[in-house]
């Protein structure tokens, strides 16, 4: 928005002032807008000449209110805006003057150069003064307007050759290289952030890695020097082999690969190993018969697979055959080879050597060496892999038995598929038996079965053979029919229902129902001491005792588990009695989520009695010492929502409910008096009784359901106490303490008091 400005050296000053301050509404709108621009710091050297705030401040009309008094708050804001406008105008004058002076200097230099180059410089100079006087300046662009009519008709854009391109030199925008010595590895920085002094888990060594030379890796840029050296050696070997092969090809191109390998002498020892491998490969290539590869069969079942591809109806038999072979994929000899050594020395049908492999490594409680612990770690990893493979095997069998929802759908078999299947079976029997004589007859029979069609019977209705009792049957009254089975015949409600379509897997079965995050221990994970286990077996005395005792193992019935739980409870009671008072205060609780400490081990049903009592006692003591750490308290966070109740309104509504009950009581009493005029009333009419429950019931009608949720009996009782103090009410309880009785005097006295 532009306005006219006031200038002191203007002849039409009165006219400008008249036009500037005539419209009061426009003047106030401009003033408010300019004050807002000044407070928002939106005034700069470009738009400072568009604001006439200095003229308005000079007039002082906009600063006066209705009582012709100056508003000093507006005056201070206006003065601040005038200072900003004035300073911006000074900056604008400075920049524009600099541009003008630089333009004049450039024009002077250009004119001098043009004068020197031209032959008639004086004539042109004289004519130039006259031309400069006739030059017109465009007020919009500030550029001179040419007098040539052709130029005026076709306006041409003048390009500034100095600022023709906006690209900056690459060196100015190029990022400087950072100092590599001051750069911190982000992985190491993250490790330092995660490190605190909270415990052993947050130690710095636990967050860092260690290479194969037992060196702590603090930086991700550190690489394995051994691997780097091996990579360099491999590259050198490849280069030497390529160079050697090129030389051999140039000298003796007609010789075979074997002869070149034998004749060439290798001086470097590094090339010996790859050259031997190449010779072995070349020998193998000579013995391979490439002409028989296309004819050879990989497996005996490939022919059956091709038949299945040609005829899809044979797929079911082929899959069943493969599944049967998979079920019996290992023979007894293969099982003996697959099971570790000492497979024949087992106890209760379980391999003790395998049991040792399945034992997970525990802390080094005994004085065993590090090599022995490494062996235990290897055995533990193989045991865990074996357990996963065993789980996967059972999952595969369970998936085969589980069909899902599709299992209960009725399948629609086409007759053509059945006929084709019968013909295929006949052809298979013919090929197996080798009866070539019956070939034509079987083909004719199969073709006859395909061509034969059952003749459709014509439906005929005989109207003469009608039954006399037909009408009685049709128009007989229908009795009440039930499709449900009688209650007396029902044995079990779920007996005639389909089983739940639930897919069981070994992972689900081995997890506890109450605590799904915890798995049952499928195998015994107790680590036996060196005295108990020798090369994967218990002591010979224990094994011989178990073999000599050929008793049938006890069945894991309810008595078995009851005895185990009772024994466990007895052990816990003995532990509690043996503990001192100081240990109870300062000690920590056992971890309830530990596999070995969480009740009875499920493997006790499949294991024999442990003869080594000392080892079991030692293990129990170790468990007591190792598993002492506090349980994390599972705190439930409840949402706290503040109730919004208008207590003043509630108090008025309680008093209104009391008055409504009083009016109902009085109207009921008047009706009784009018109906029974002859009877005398001996009860005290000055005091009346109300129940607190009736008062609350009357309040519930005055609120909506959402508001009524926040109102409780406590709020109502507090309001009732205030009303009792104000109006002299008496509150007493009932005999059963299930309600409150409010005694009040006559309403007239209470209203008069209020």
Curated annotation (Swiss-Prot):
Protein name: Condensin complex subunit 2
Bias type Basic and acidic residues, positions: 362-371
UniProt KW Nucleus keyword: yes
GO cellular component labels: condensin complex; cytoplasm; nucleus
Species assigned in the record: Saccharomyces cerevisiae (strain ATCC 204508 / S288c)
Compartmental location: Nucleus; Cytoplasm; Chromosome
Keyword entries, A-Z: Cell cycle, Cell division, Chromosome, Cytoplasm, DNA condensation, Mitosis, Nucleus, Phosphoprotein
Regions of compositional bias (Gly residues) in chain numbering: 118-128
Additional remark text: Present with 704 molecules/cell in log phase SD medium.
One GO process term, biological-process aspect: mitotic chromosome condensation
């Amino acid at each position: 928005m532009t306005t006219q400005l006031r200038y002191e050296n203007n002849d039409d000053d009165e006219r400008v002032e008249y036009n500037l301050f005539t419209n009061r509404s426009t003047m106030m709108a401009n003033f408010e807008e300019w004050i807002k621009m000044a407070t928002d710091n939106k005034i700069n050297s470009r738009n400072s000449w568009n604001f006439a705030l200095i003229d308005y401040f000079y007039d002082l009309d906009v600063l006066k209110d209705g009582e012709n008094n100056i508003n000093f708050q507006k005056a201070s804001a206006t003065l601040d805006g005038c200072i900003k406008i004035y300073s911006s105008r000074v900056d604008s004058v400075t920049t524009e003057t600099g541009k003008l002076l630089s333009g004049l200097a450039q024009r002077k230099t250009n004119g001098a150069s043009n004068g020197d180059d031209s032959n008639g410089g004086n004539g042109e100079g004289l004519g130039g003064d006259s031309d400069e006087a006739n030059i017109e300046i465009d007020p919009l662009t500030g550029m001179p307007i040419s007098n040539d009519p052709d130029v005026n008709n076709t306006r041409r854009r003048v390009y500034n050759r100095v600022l023709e391109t906006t690209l900056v030199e690459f060196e100015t925008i190029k990022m400087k290289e950072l100092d590599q010595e001051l750069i911190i590895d982000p992985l190491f920085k993250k490790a330092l952030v995660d490190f605190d002094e909270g415990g052993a888990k947050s130690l710095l060594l636990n967050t860092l890695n260690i290479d194969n030379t037992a060196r702590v890796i603090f930086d991700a840029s550190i690489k394995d020097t051994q691997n780097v050296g091996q990579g360099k050696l491999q590259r050198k070997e490849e280069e030497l082999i390529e160079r050697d092969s090129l030389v051999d090809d140039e000298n003796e191109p007609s010789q075979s690969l074997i002869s070149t390998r034998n004749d060439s002498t290798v001086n470097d020892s590094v090339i010996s190993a790859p050259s031997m491998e190449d010779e072995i490969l070349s020998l193998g290539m000579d013995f391979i018969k490439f002409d028989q590869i296309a004819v050879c069969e990989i497996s005996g079942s490939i022919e059956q697979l091709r038949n299945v591809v040609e005829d899809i109806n044979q797929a079911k038999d082929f899959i069943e055959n493969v599944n049967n072979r998979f079920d019996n994929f290992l023979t007894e000899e293969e099982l003996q080879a697959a099971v570790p050594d000492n497979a024949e020395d087992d106890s209760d049908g379980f391999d003790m050597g395998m049991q040792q492999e399945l034992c997970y490594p525990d802390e080094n409680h005994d004085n065993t060496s590090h090599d022995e612990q490494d062996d235990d770690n290897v055995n533990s990893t193989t045991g865990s892999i074996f357990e996963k493979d065993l789980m996967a095997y059972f999952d595969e069998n369970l998936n085969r038995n589980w069909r899902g929802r599709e299992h209960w759908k009725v399948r629609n078999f086409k007759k053509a598929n059945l006929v084709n299947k019968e013909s295929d079976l006949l052809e298979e029997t013919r090929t197996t038996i080798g009866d070539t004589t019956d070939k034509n007859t079987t083909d004719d029979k199969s073709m006859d079965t395909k061509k034969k069609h059952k003749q459709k019977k014509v439906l005929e209705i005989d109207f003469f053979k009608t039954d006399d009792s037909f009408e009685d049957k049709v128009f007989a009254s229908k009795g009440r029919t039930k499709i449900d089975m009688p209650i007396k015949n029902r044995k079990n409600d779920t007996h005639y229902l389909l089983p739940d379509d639930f897919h069981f897997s070994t992972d689900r079965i081995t997890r506890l129902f109450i605590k799904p995050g915890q798995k049952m221990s499928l195998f015994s994970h107790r680590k036996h001491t060196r005295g108990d286990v020798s090369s994967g077996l218990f002591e010979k005395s224990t094994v011989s005792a178990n073999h000599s005792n050929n008793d049938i193992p006890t069945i894991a019935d309810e008595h078995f588990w009851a005895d185990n739980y009772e024994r466990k409870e007895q052990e816990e009671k003995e532990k509690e009695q043996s503990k001192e008072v100081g240990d109870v205060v300062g000690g920590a609780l056992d971890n309830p989520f530990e596999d070995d400490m969480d009740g009875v081990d499920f493997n006790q049903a499949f294991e024999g009695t442990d003869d080594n009592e000392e080892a079991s006692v030692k293990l129990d003591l170790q468990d007591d010492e190792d598993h002492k750490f506090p349980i994390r308290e599972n705190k439930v966070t409840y949402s706290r929502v503040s109730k919004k109740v208008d207590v003043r309104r509630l108090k008025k509504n309680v008093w209104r409910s009391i008055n409504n009950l009083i009016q109902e009581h009085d109207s009921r009493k008047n009706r009784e008096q009018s109906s029974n005029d002859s009877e005398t009333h001996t009860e005290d009419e000055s005091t009346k009784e109300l129940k607190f429950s009736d008062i609350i019931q009357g309040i519930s009608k005055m609120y909506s359901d959402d508001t009524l949720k926040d109102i409780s009996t406590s709020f109502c009782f507090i309001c009732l106490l205030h009303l009792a103090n104000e109006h002299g009410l008496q509150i007493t309880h009932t005999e059963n303490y299930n309600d409150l009785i409010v005694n009040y005097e006559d309403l007239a006295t209470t209203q008069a008091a209020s």
